[in-house]
Amino acid sequence: MSDIITVTLPDGSQKQTARGTTIADFVRESIGPGLAKAALFARVNGQDMDLARKLDEDVKLQIFTPKSPESLELIRHDAAHVVASAVQKLFPGTQVTIGPATEEGFYYDFFREKPFTPEDLEKIEAEANAELKRDMAFVRTEISMDEAVRLFEEKGEKFKVEIVKDIAAKGAKTLTLYTHGDWVDFCLGPHAPSTGKIGIIKILSSSGAYWRGDHRNPMLQRVYGTAFFDKKQLAEYLTRIEESKKRDHRKLGKELDLFHFHPYSPGSAFWTPKGTTLYTTLSNWMRQLTQNDGYVEIKTPLMFNKGLWETSGHWGKYKENMFLVLDSESGEHDFSLKPMNCPSHHLFYGFKKHSYRDLPLRYHTQDVLHRNEAAGSLGGLTRVRQFAQDDAHIYCTEAQITDEVRRFVKLLDHVYKAVGLTYAVKLSTRPEQRLGDDSLWDRAEGGLKAALESLGLEYELAPGDGAFYGPKIDFAVSDSIGRRWQLGTMQLDYLAPERFDLTYVGEDNAEHRPVVLHRAIFGSFERFTAILIEHFAGAFPAWLAPIQAVLVTVADRQNDYARKVRDSLRAKGYRVEFDERGLSMNAKIREAQLQKVPFTLVVGDNEVSGEGVSPRRYGGEDLKTMKVTDFEALLAKEAALP
């Protein structure tokens, strides 16, 4: 074995170094001191690692610095460790549980008798930032599972002991520890070289959370926080958070009278007339788009016997997330409300024999689904128990994958652009544990790549993140204030056709397995509606607005004319109201602005005599007085489904 290994860098260049050289030393000696000083972690053959790890074989190496988008997640994980250390220093006897990084920060769950007060959170933040100034190294070690159990038992960390034993029960032989100062926790890593690499930590809030999300378990204290490389980034984030609070769909949903919730049916929305209009407009829009794109809409039952879920594999893995129904004949909970559409669509496909000439078959549905989400996880429309998806399943041949993916991405692109959402694409490829041989995965991944590249789309490659039954493409959108939301997906599935014995007759008159493509654009209607409420801050474009125009008269003598205009516009399908309340004109205009109605139509004597209206856009832009027919033409253009 040679003592020299080859390191391939992202630009394709190659460098040699001694076997056993640490990543940090390699960067400093072979690339330069500037990058070595800025480096936070590395990706080695697709696996993220600390800079202190050694290079023992030929590798592909990528270095991440504060300029890398991926680095924020790293320092937020670091910050979770630092905050946990600060809490245990300030509040002896507090036990630690878990503390992951999240999309925009991190949280850590603690067990203690008393909830944290606002004053406690201020102390925690101050101590955490003091630990950053001490610039303590993160040191990685590995110990046996027995040693890990003893370590955390000696520390009195019963929750950590429980987790370690669970990990050991799954076959793990060793556990990775990270220490900074005298505080230690276990995690997979990686971590930055030291606490000083974190610029600043901000504690945001605290709340209660049950251990492992189960109300039968102890209540924990969850501390939320975030971290950035400098104060400017933090200030921008806090400004965005304040704007987010103003746009919170739960707040706007109440102010704009769109939806309600009731404890008798947690996680299930009551849609008001205005909210129902918003919901059905999205529903009808998606229905029109899919029909125009060659989909057929189907409906399948709400409730199924467990046999379906045993065939699909969900009964053993997903049963706890289902609402189970008692079978009066067997006396057992053998039925459930469906939590997803896929298995029932596979049954539907199997009702008939199919030829290669029938494919691709594109089934679309908007059926209601139910998932037994933990009560503590429910939040407005973004996490619910009853919902509907713009769900579709495409049954096609392997040769049709690229064209079908391309077709789907074009539809998704149209939808997101129509509502002003930009998006990023991630392609997740084969995991270690997977179905099928490498040639199958080569073809599947190649088909997805070819589709994305033919459309000129940039995408992030996520090696190993695909499902065991096939690779997938995920689409994360960014809203008007820069927040990212995971929405669309396209997943290839080679397993379902096997489980459900799905076939088609090929040109050779032999039976073949189709490929199943699972895809969604909205995700759930409820969550997509929440995102749009916040994205538009409740000020929807005319085509989506529950009320597109409201008429306001200067005096009562114009009321008959206003009713005539309202009725005329309604007859043509527009959503128009006339505010007949006994308020002043200015009060009515102000109310229309508060309700974010796209057009307020002022009617006075001049408008009556001229058969016109004086439109005012939401936000205050006055348009010139125009004939009703001219306004109708304007509204027709802006109210048309995109």
Curated annotation (Swiss-Prot):
Keywords, in A-Z order: Aminoacyl-tRNA synthetase, ATP-binding, Cytoplasm, Ligase, Metal-binding, Nucleotide-binding, Protein biosynthesis, RNA-binding, tRNA-binding, Zinc
TGS domain ranges (all copies): 1-65
Residue sites binding Zn(2+) per the record: C342, H393, H518
Region (Catalytic): 248-541
GO MF annotations in UniProt: ATP binding; metal ion binding; threonine-tRNA ligase activity; tRNA binding
Subcellular location: Cytoplasm
InterPro entries documented for this protein: aa-tRNA-synt_IIb, aa-tRNA-synth_II, aa-tRNA-synth_II/BPL/LPL, Anticodon-bd, Anticodon-bd_dom_sf, Beta-grasp_dom_sf, TGS, TGS-like
One Pfam family here: tRNA-synt_2b
Leading EC class: ligase
Keyword Cell wall biogenesis/degradation: no
SMART domains found in the cross-reference section: tRNA_SAD (SM00863)
Free-text cofactor note: Binds 1 zinc ion per subunit.
One Gene Ontology term from the biological process aspect of the record: threonyl-tRNA aminoacylation
GO cellular component: cytoplasm
Regions annotated as coiled coil: none
Keyword ATP-binding: yes
Required co-factors: Zn(2+)
Gene3D superfamilies: 3.10.20.30, 3.30.54.20, Anticodon-binding domain, Bira Bifunctional Protein, Domain 2, Threonyl-trna Synthetase, Chain A, domain 2
Catalytic activity: tRNA(Thr) + L-threonine + ATP = L-threonyl-tRNA(Thr) + AMP + diphosphate + H(+)
Enzyme Commission identifier(s): 6.1.1.3
Function: Catalyzes the attachment of threonine to tRNA(Thr) in a two-step reaction: L-threonine is first activated by ATP to form Thr-AMP and then transferred to the acceptor end of tRNA(Thr). Also edits incorrectly charged L-seryl-tRNA(Thr).
HAMAP family associated with the record: Thr_tRNA_synth (MF_00184)
Family: Belongs to the class-II aminoacyl-tRNA synthetase family.
NCBIfam families: thrS
Subunit structure: Homodimer.
Protein name: Threonine--tRNA ligase
